[in-house]
């Protein structure tokens, strides 16, 4: 008998002991019987064992509302450029920069004072400008202005911080002998020796540099903005930089000066409640800061031109017009072609119809004044700045109002904290999901009501939601990120006919396909552990075997992403619209072939099964099963749809544009791809980065050295440098051992080399020499005599000698930049394991969005091709659809009639529901005829259509189907990669006729057709570009117009059909599918093709003997291949 204390601290007698066992799956201790719980096992696998945490990370959350007491300063600018012919091509240089200041009045006043310190700065109306055609001069002056802003506001942050902690800072300055509080190291504020404090109204500063299309144009031309001099900034604040060039644009180039916030509370009991209402308090911020951000309004308006953005957001200002080529010629050559009034001629204007308007505008604003193209360009540039500034303020106020009114939050929102629409809509979604989750948890068990105890003992307290995570949404991490992205398959885009189609063609598209798909159920909860995942795979295989049709909303089926094998039905049951695509062969191909080792969602599994495919789910260690379905995005998308409909009724163009963009961009946010490459400046290398490079876990893939004329520096000419061999220069470098006139150097502190001159060399003759004359004097005299005679060069006409003297040499000037090498060196770091650390994006949601969209298309396929099944796919009359493009189908006349009869319930009406209804589960989507008659609003068709390639087609016209109308409207040309203004329907038709002539070996009278356009060749940090980093050059791009060559379908008769088992994809016919050995550990390994992995003749004989030998007499043998 033992005695021990129980959980309440009381002494108790232990009368008996029973051995217990611990479950390896869920960790629970048991004596007799035990059954694991899914949730407990998942938690034990992820949180306790830590195995799952290497594959999944809880999506991190931080309230996107704006921090209190933040003041904003906006610097809105625009530049005008001209081209210069250089050795590498036509390079663009800025010659004019206009900017305006807005925001907090005190900050604007201080910034204006700093701007006026430049004596070359001029004012125009409410703005300022620089005008200088020397390369790099305008950029240098703008850089100096921004540097003065950074230094001024960083020092002001330190001064205000020190004023709130005067005693502590004065003591540090005194003890450390620092010249000022700016010199105090940041670490002494991060880990203070005495408590610090800040007033509740202590403010931070956001300085936003704004422009339209500056991330792909202006900021690249102003390359000097990339260089920082850290020695000019106060040491008391920490300087961090976010630098991310991506996809031809500078996505991030932000700098933040921060100091620790002593009021920060790490675990605040009220944080969950406040953040659920969209309120951020001063104790939520880890730092107080001055933040410099570069934001492009083009990225915040979904790539709309400034003129269209101004109209979309109902601005009372409009963008002007400018003859760019005339300005370029004038700046480059000093003249341009003008008419009798001195106005640029018609060829300079993009739209000649505006010439009269621009003339009247000039005469109205400048009566009696001769046309000045530079002044007109200046006013145009300043007008662009004015429109951009108005657009920026409209965006800021409108998104703030949207955050409060439509999402129901109580705080404020600053759209410029994040650079793009996808990043902002992702933040909105996380905020709304977090708020809904907190509300659900509070409704289930309020904080004041403890959960009733299940057993005798302590009352179990309900765990409250964490403010650091978004509901129960997890992001694939490291190896799982790569695996999940295999289920991310793109949209449908291919024609089923090449060339002209001379019958009616109707265009239908799904209304808001991604928005509708987002409202359907998505995976939610912590992924199951391998044991329960395997059990669900077995259950799913049983359902696929025993039942011919399965509902997408069957309660027995859990959301999952699995590896499968799928075998198609007979050719009589196949359709020209396959249910899924494959990347085998290196191309994304929509195919009816058998699928092997494909990673798909359970939605795709059910779609394949219901279309007659035989699907088998494979057991794989990377298979993922989630515990439950939940409409995670439905609330957010529904709010956007309702806001758009409300804006339509109220004629509010601003809210309409915002709600439409946010819905369309949410899917793209979930599908964000990441890699293991980072691009940073050498001066931003952290100690962790240096350690990883030293240990070899990270490597430097590429080094880019920045150099540009706009960088600040000093010109040095060698011809003005002193002669290094003169007596004066030599005296500075050498000291005679016995020179009494030579000043003795100051004694070193360590006392080395005192009084010992015996070992020092002397250039003079020693006093105790045996000879009076220097032994080298004779040699010197001989050398001087030889030099005086000069070289032997024959005289006459045959002589070609050059007699230039050394002192006549012209040295090339050298420029010494005012920056450290670390500030000019950009490193490309790459992780060797190639695994992405992800805790932001729930990529599986994007996979399910595409899965639901494929389910929509599968139902659409049933509408069009259901009656044709049972007839071989090649023996049917004609396809009901001719072209598919992501969310649209081009259908024939028979396909249109089937849409009106069999698919009438899927054609959108005023009462059609486009969002998922949990009370009545089903697929919710609708489509409509894309091109409507402008006269009566009825459907239209094209009497003749030509298809040349994916995203290259033409509709000749649009004829109304209404017999009483029959209006003939314009057609439609789609020409990806070509300048659309140069193409008409007849041009596409001529291209096809030439293709037919060449195909049949004839000599075509039609010349090869092509389109030309001038492009801006942007070079950021490209390793293989012939251009310098951060430059923009003009190039003429010529593209040949020709039909599709690399087909992803097979041709039969007049139509194209998807590959099937009878007509396999030629790109994959040579692939060998190896069967993995037992215990293989790399499920992500690509398919290997080993052409020499076959049996030899001797091995074939051994196999034959084993197969036909008598079992009683044959001994066991092993054969290794």
Swiss-Prot record:
Q: Which SUPFAM superfamilies match?
A: DNA/RNA polymerases, Ribonuclease H-like
Q: What are the protein's UniProt keywords?
A: DNA replication, DNA-binding, DNA-directed DNA polymerase, Host nucleus, Nucleotidyltransferase, Transferase, Viral DNA replication
**Could you tell me the superkingdom of the organism this chain comes from?**
Viruses
Ranges of Acidic residues composition bias in the record: 739-759
**InterPro entries, sorted:** DNA-dir_DNA_pol_B, DNA-dir_DNA_pol_B_adenovir, DNA-dir_DNA_pol_B_CS, DNA-dir_DNA_pol_B_mt/vir, DNA/RNA_pol_sf, DNA_pol_palm_dom_sf, RNaseH-like_sf
Its top-level enzyme class, in one word, is transferase
Where does the UniProt annotation place the signal sequence? none
One GO BP: viral DNA genome replication
Swiss-Prot/TrEMBL catalytic activity: DNA(n) + a 2'-deoxyribonucleoside 5'-triphosphate = DNA(n+1) + diphosphate
Q: One Pfam family name from the record? A: DNA_pol_B_2
Assembly and partners are described as: Heterodimer with the terminal protein; this heterodimer binds to bp 9 to 18 of the genome. Forms a complex with viral pTP, DBP and hosts NFIA and POU2F1/OCT1 for initiation of replication.
Other remarks in the entry: This DNA polymerase requires a protein as a primer.
What is this protein's function?
Answer: Eukaryotic-type DNA polymerase involved in viral genomic replication. DNA synthesis is protein primed, and acts in a strand displacement replication. Assembles in complex with viral pTP, DBP, host NFIA and host POU2F1/OCT1 on viral origin of replication. The polymerase covalently transfers dCMP onto pTP, thereby initiating complementary strand synthesis.
* Similarity comment text for this entry: Belongs to the DNA polymerase type-B family.
What's the name of the protein?
DNA polymerase
Q: Which organism is it from?
A: Fowl adenovirus A serotype 1 (strain CELO / Phelps) (FAdV-1)
UniProt gene name: POL
């Amino acid at each position: 008998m033992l005695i021990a204390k129980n959980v309440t601290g009381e002494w108790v007698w232990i009368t008996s002991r029973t051995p217990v066992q611990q479950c390896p799956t869920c960790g629970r201790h048991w004596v007799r019987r035990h059954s694991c719980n899914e949730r407990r096992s998942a938690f034990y696998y992820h949180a306790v064992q830590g195995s799952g945490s290497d594959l999944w990370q809880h999506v991190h959350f931080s309230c996107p509302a704006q921090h209190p007491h933040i003041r904003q300063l906006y610097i809105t600018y625009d530049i005008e450029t001209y081209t210069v012919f250089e050795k590498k091509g036509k390079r663009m240089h800025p010659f004019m920069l206009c900017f305006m200041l807005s925001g907090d009045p005190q900050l604007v006043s201080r910034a204006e004072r700093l701007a006026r310190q430049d004596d070359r700065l001029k004012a125009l109306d409410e703005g300022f400008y620089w005008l200088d055609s020397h390369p790099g001069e305008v950029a240098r002056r703008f850089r100096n202005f921004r540097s003065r802003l950074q230094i001024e506001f960083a020092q002001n942050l330190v001064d205000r911080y020190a004023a709130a902690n005067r005693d502590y800072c004065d003591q540090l300055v005194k003890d450390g002998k620092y010249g000022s509080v700016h010199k105090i190291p940041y670490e002494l504020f991060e880990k203070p020796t005495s408590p610090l404090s800040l007033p509740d109204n202590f403010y931070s500063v956001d300085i936003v540099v704004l422009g339209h299309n500056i991330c792909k144009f202006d900021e690249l031309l102003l390359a000097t903005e990339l260089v920082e001099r850290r020695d000019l900034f106060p040491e008391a604040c920490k300087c961090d930089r976010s630098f991310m060039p991506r996809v031809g644009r500078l996505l991030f180039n932000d700098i933040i000066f921060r100091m620790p916030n002593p009021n920060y509370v790490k675990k605040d009991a009220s944080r969950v409640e406040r953040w659920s209402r969209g309120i951020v308090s001063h104790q939520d911020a880890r730092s107080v800061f001055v933040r410099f951000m570069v934001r492009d309004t083009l990225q915040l308006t979904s790539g709309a031109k400034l003129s269209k953005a101004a109209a979309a957001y109902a601005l009372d200002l409009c963008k002007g017009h400018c003859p760019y080529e005339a300005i370029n010629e004038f700046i480059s050559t000093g003249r341009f072609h003008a008419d009798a009034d001195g106005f640029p001629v018609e060829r300079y204007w993009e739209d000649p119809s505006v010439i009269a308007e621009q003339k009247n505008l000039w005469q109205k604003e400048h009566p009696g004044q001769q046309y000045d193209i530079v002044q007109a360009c200046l006013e145009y540039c300043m007008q662009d700045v004015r429109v951009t500034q108005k657009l920026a303020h409209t965006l800021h106020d409108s998104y703030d109002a949207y955050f409060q009114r439509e999402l129901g939050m109580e705080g404020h929102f600053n759209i410029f904290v994040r650079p793009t629409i996808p990043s902002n809509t992702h933040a909105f979604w996380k905020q709304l999901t977090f708020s809904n989750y907190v509300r659900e948890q509070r409704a289930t068990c309020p904080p004041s009501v403890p959960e009733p105890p299940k057993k005798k003992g302590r009352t179990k307290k309900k765990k409250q939601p964490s403010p650091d995570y978004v509901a129960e949404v997890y992001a694939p991490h490291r190896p799982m990120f790569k695996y999940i992205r295999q289920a991310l398959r793109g949209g449908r885009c291919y024609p089923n006919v090449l060339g002209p189609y001379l019958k009616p063609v109707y265009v239908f598209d799904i209304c808001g396909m991604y928005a509708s798909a987002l409202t359907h159920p998505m995976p939610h909860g912590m992924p199951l552990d391998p044991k329960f995942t395997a059990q669900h795979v077995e259950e799913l295989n049983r359902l696929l075997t025993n039942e011919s049709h399965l509902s997408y909303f069957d309660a027995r089926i859990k959301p999952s992403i699995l590896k499968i094998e799928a075998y198609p039905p007979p050719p009589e049951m196949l359709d020209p619209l396959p249910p899924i695509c494959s990347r085998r062969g290196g191309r994304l191909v929509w195919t009816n072939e058998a699928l092997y080792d494909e990673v798909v969602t359970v939605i795709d599994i059910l779609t394949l099964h219901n279309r007659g495919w035989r699907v088998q789910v494979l057991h794989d260690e990377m298979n993922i099963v989630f515990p439950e379905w939940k409409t995670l995005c439905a609330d957010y998308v529904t709010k956007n749809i309702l806001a758009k409909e409300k804006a339509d009724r109220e004629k509010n163009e601003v809210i309409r544009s915002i709600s439409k963009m946010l819905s369309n961009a949410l899917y793209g946010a979930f599908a964000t791809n990441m890699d293991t490459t980072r691009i940073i400046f050498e001066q931003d290398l952290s100690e962790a980065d240096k350690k990883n490079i030293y240990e070899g876990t990270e490597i430097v893939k590429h080094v880019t050295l920045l150099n540009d004329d706009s960088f600040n520096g000093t010109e040095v000419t060698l011809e003005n440098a002193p002669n290094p061999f003169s007596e004066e220069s030599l005296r500075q470098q050498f000291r005679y051992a016995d020179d009494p006139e030579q000043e003795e150097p100051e004694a070193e502190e360590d006392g080395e080399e005192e009084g010992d001159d015996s070992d020092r060399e002397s250039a003079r003759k020693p006093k105790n020499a045996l000879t009076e004359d220097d032994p080298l004097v004779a040699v010197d005299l001989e050398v001087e005599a030889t030099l005086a005679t000069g070289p032997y060069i024959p005289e006459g006409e045959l002589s070609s000698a050059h007699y230039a003297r050394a002192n006549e040499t012209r040295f090339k000037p050298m420029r010494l930049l005012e920056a450290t090498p670390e500030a000019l060196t950009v490193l490309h770091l790459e992780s060797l394991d190639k695994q992405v650390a992800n805790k932001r994006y729930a990529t599986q949601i994007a996979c399910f969005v595409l899965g639901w969209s494929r389910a929509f298309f599968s139902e659409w396929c049933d509408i069009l091709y259901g009656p044709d099944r049972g007839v071989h796919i090649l023996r049917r009359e004609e396809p009901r659809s001719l072209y598919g493009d992501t969310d649209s189908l081009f259908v024939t006349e028979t396909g249109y009639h089937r849409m009106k009869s069999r698919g009438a319930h899927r054609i959108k009406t005023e009462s059609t529901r486009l969002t998922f209804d949990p009370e009545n589960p089903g697929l919710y989507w609708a489509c409509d005829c894309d091109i409507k008659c402008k006269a009566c609003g009825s459907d239209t068709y094209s009497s003749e259509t030509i298809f040349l390639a994916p995203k290259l087609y033409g509709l000749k016209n649009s004829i109304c189907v209404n017999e009483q109308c029959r209006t003939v409207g314009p057609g439609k040309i789609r020409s990806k990669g070509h300048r659309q203004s140069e193409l008409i329907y007849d041009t596409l038709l001529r291209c096809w006729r030439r293709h037919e002539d060449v195909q049949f070996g004839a000599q075509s009278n039609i010349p090869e057709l092509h389109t030309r356009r001038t492009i801006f060749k942007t070079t950021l940090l490209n390793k293989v570009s012939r251009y310098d980093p951060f430059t923009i050059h003009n190039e003429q791009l010529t593209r040949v117009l020709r039909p599709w060559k690399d087909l992803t379908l097979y041709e039969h008769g007049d139509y194209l059909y998807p590959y099937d088992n009878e007509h396999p994809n030629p790109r994959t016919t040579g692939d060998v599918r190896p069967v993995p050995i037992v215990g293989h550990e790399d499920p992500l390994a690509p398919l290997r093709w080993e052409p020499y992995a076959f049996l030899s003749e001797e091995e074939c004989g051994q196999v034959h003997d084993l197969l036909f030998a008598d079992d009683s007499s044959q001994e066991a043998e092993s054969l290794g291949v």
